[in-house]
């Protein structure tokens, strides 16, 4: 990238096309994490119509990218969750919260949940995107 920004595209995730999984700013330690869906490392969507399984995989993917950039879950400062079916997501909020606590703990960044008509992958139910600030 220009201006010395570093891109992060870790092994274990599908090779990105038209985006990077993360960008680390050259002037600081801010990491912008690209949206992640429930794709496995072969680029196959997992979880079928199960929003909890898809959230679990999408969050795991985001945390994989964050780790490859040198960060940890507690470095997340903002996260946006894009959801195809808000009613289904809310109906499973308790289970989704359990996934969060298992993978991240009880640190919560600033968050927004946004309902969308569909995601890039037509079968994806949820996508997570984040920003992290790493210690200097």
Predicted feature locations:
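N-terminal presequence-like segments and the immediate start of the first folded domain
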Residues: 1-60, 64-77, 83-136
């Amino acid at each position: 990238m220009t201006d010395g920004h570093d891109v992060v595209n870790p092994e274990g995730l599908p090779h990105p096309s038209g985006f990077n999984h993360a960008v680390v700013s050259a002037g600081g330690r801010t990491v912008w994490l690209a949206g992640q869906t429930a794709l496995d490392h072969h680029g196959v969507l997992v979880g079928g119509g199960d929003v909890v399984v898809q959230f679990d995989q999408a969050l795991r993917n985001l945390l994989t990218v964050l780790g490859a950039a040198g960060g940890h879950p507690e470095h997340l400062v903002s996260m946006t969750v894009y959801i195809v079916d808000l009613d289904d997501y809310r109906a499973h909020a308790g289970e989704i919260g359990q996934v969060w606590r298992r993978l991240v703990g009880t640190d919560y960044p600033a968050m927004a949940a946004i309902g969308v008509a569909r995601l890039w992958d037509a079968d994806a139910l949820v996508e997570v995107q984040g920003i992290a600030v790493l210690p200097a």
